[in-house]
């Protein structure tokens, strides 16, 4: 059964959601699933903007056919070549062989790489560049190059008639759609924002400079609707979500807040982390606490983007950093986290040294500060260490 929805005048949503996939990119847990969005514009000429993942291929093709309602498909616009959006290109070409592909110069080599048998269609492709326009009749589409947001060939398509920005992976989020298509129809801040932050920080976070460049381009466009390739479509309160992207891409904390991230084998480091968190909270500071062994690394990364101060509490393990914390620090470096304050808690039954090792890793991050006040636990926290905890808590609160 087809499942299509109207986005705006003669623009139809033809995507589909997958609730079976356990991990996005086989890396990031998505307990709420994910949507693969695609759109059809009906005019004197028809256009399909992107395809979908193979997992929803049958539903996607049925939706496209329903939207076209017997009409031929004139154009397939490829904004992004990642297989979760491009997997069905070959199937679309088989079903509508007379269509013309619309791509940019960086897309063509990828098309030939992923679909080596479709040379004729690729040779006839319309290759567009920044500012080029495709006239469908009433709808005029302008192309905005968005390299490395988050692949080199990415572009966005702006419908000047409806003010719709088809934004590729930008402004996307984890989470399958639940009937409602639009962000204003759901509790986005309550139910979707954490997934949107986790999506941005782990998928796009490394490319903040490139996102900033695209935001500057977007600021010159009269955008009424943002139609991403994942998650709800935005037609109201666009400035709020664009503001989030501006913060995230500048790696500026969303909140003056503390996140305590700890690893603990037998509960002793956890006890110290919780004791420190309580002292910080008592000073009127907003605090969140997470066990790194119980949350996915992608969630910890997102929390580090959200909060202004990060407390890492870990035992020494094989003379090194407890592995969940070590993995987090490697990811933070790879994703270019910067401008944060860190406080450290270490534990070791005979040679505590994780604080020194973590500080060295944090030193590889741009403009990050490690507070002098740290807590060293030998086996388990004792009552005599209350002053040490208090000093660390005071330093954390002062860092706000």
Model-flagged regions — what are they?
Residues 4-66, 156-159, 163-167, 269:
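Conserved beta-strand hairpin/beta-sheet module of binuclear metal-dependent hydrolase folds
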Residues 49-51, 73-81, 101-104, 165-169, ...:
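Active-site neighborhood of phospho(di)ester-bond hydrolases with catalytic His/Asp-centered motifs
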Residues 88, 296-300:
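Short acidic active-site motifs
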Residues 45-47, 75, 139, 163-166, ...:
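Structural motif
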Residues 44, 55-102:
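Active-site metal-binding motif and surrounding structural segment of the metallo-beta-lactamase
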Residues 5-9, 102-154, 210-213:
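Metallo-beta-lactamase
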Residues 150-154, 162, 170-205, 249-253:
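Active-site-proximal loop/helix segment associated with metal-binding centers of metalloenzymes
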Residues 177, 188-226, 230-233, 275-290, ...:
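FMN-binding flavodoxin-like domain, especially the glycine-rich phosphate-binding loop
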């Amino acid at each position: 059964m087809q499942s299509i929805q109207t986005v705006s005048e003669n623009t139809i949503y033809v995507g589909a959601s997958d609730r079976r996939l356990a991990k996005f990119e086989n890396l990031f847990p998505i307990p709420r699933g994910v949507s693969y969005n695609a759109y059809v514009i009906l005019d004197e000429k028809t256009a399909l903007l992107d395809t979908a993942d193979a997992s929803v291929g049958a539903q996607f093709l049925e939706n496209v056919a329903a939207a076209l309602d017997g009409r031929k498909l004139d154009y397939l616009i490829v904004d992004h070549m990642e297989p979760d959006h491009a997997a069905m290109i070959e199937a679309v070409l088989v079903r509508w062989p007379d269509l013309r592909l619309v791509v940019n110069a960086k897309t063509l080599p990828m098309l030939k790489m992923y679909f080596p048998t479709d040379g004729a269609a690729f040779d006839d492709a319309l290759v567009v560049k920044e500012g080029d326009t495709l006239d469908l009749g009433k709808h005029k589409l302008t192309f905005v190059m968005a390299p490395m947001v988050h692949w080199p060939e990415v572009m966005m398509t702006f419908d000047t008639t409806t003010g719709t920005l088809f934004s590729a992976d930008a402004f996307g989020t984890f989470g399958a759609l639940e009937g409602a298509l639009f962000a204003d129809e759901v509790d986005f801040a309550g139910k979707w924002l954490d997934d949107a932050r986790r999506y941005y920080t782990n998928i796009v976070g490394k490319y903040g400079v490139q996102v900033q460049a695209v935001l500057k381009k977007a600021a010159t466009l009269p955008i009424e609707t943002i139609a991403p390739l994942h998650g709800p479509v935005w037609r109201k309160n666009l400035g709020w979500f664009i503001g989030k992207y501006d913060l995230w891409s500048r790696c500026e904390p969303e909140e003056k807040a503390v996140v305590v991230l700890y690893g603990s084998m037998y509960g002793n480091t956890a006890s110290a982390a919780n004791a420190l968190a309580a002292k910080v909270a008592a000073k009127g500071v907003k605090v969140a606490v997470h066990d790194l062994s119980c949350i996915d690394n992608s969630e910890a990364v997102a929390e580090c983007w959200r909060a202004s101060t990060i407390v890492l509490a870990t035992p020494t393990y094989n003379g090194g950093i407890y592995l969940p914390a070590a993995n987090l620090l490697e990811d933070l470096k790879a994703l270019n986290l910067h401008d944060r304050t860190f406080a450290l808690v270490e534990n070791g039954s005979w040679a505590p040294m994780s604080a020194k090792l973590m500080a060295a890793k944090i030193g590889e991050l741009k403009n990050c500060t490690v507070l002098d006040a740290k807590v060293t636990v030998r086996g388990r926290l004792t009552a005599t260490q209350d002053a040490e905890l208090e000093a660390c808590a005071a330093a954390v609160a002062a860092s706000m």
